[in-house]
């Protein structure tokens, strides 16, 4: 576009905006559709394998949601943090899954029970989904970002409900994050002589 438009031509800005809206999402859309199709095709085999597949499903949904609402964000209200919080936690969930599915086995460390891993993924992911949904809804009603207290202008039931949803979702997400931190710390700090018994317990749990 630089050879086509002069640097001071407003049409150049319009052209780059068009690329942002209509071209940039295409690669991500192809990857998401392909991944979703693969998951659906092998859903039964994957879900019976490890809890990390559930975590990846949650991450995929959350990341997709964040991407969609990103098209409706504004730089002045809470729709912007709704978008990037969903995207960041979606990526974080993927690394959480890798932590237990790849990194811990490579270090010969024990892996926690299935139910606790699933709990951390689901609580963090669903909590963040509601957190972002509340922020996005509040932004639609004009609640400004980067302000607190009376400056938020929570003068209607809709705004209060949206911010309440944000708070509840944030609390649920924090609980999921704390569970992960405790599990991760235990994996790293557990005594070597106890690792064998934990691995055996995990194998029985998976079976």
Put a short name on every predicted segment.
Residues 32-33, 64:
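Secondary-structure boundary elements
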Residues 2-17, 34-57, 68-84, 93-122, ...:
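Juxtamembrane membrane-water interface segments of multi-pass membrane proteins
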Residues 19-29, 84-92, 174:
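Alpha-helical transmembrane segments
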